[in-house]
């Protein structure tokens, strides 16, 4: 997976993405990062400035179309022989980013992220190059760099080989069946008067799997009831839901068997 980020702050992207799991994945050649400084494509007479006043007035400055377009073309031309990349513009007005969308994007070879700043970017260049406007939530940040990093981290985890344990990505919240992940415990067996659930010490793998599944069902119902109707359930799930009075929350959920 090749990530290309058009930004005014490439050092911010590089520093964050070059650590931990994503950093090791880059060293292993599973991921690559190309952070492009949009200022490098400013008109020479403007000496690196890429913003100007907004037509019609209003507070703040607007990123100009031409430097953004030049930066995009530099990336698109460099990878034109292998892909027609999606261009993702970080915007609170866009499609909400979720695990399903991440899985879709993880199938791409190259992704271009466009990070805005100031009061926004000239609409004309957005209309010309952007394929997807994407939001990570109903709030406003100072720039698109943090949303881009959130998306890149989520997508990177789905690239084969990035996680040392491939099962990790499949058992986490929102994956596959749409449920939240079950609670996790480690040593010691007792901490601050709280003991690890005995079932996890039993050695009965089938019982452990069932307990974890039931905890996922309960946790989703309690913490994210909005997800229940999109869950994928089996017969044992349905029985547990009936026994715990959760039918209404899970009404409409899909059947696995």
For every predicted segment, state its role.
Residues 1-78, 201, 206-229:
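N-terminal nucleotide/polyanion-binding subdomain common to many enzyme families
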Residues 20-25, 103-107, 129:
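Short, solvent-exposed amphipathic alpha-helical segments in soluble enzyme
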Residues 175-232, 236-239:
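Long, charged alpha-helical interface segments
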Residues 4-6, 34-36, 88, 111-112, ...:
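Hydrophobic/aromatic beta-strand patches that form the interior of the parallel beta-sheet core
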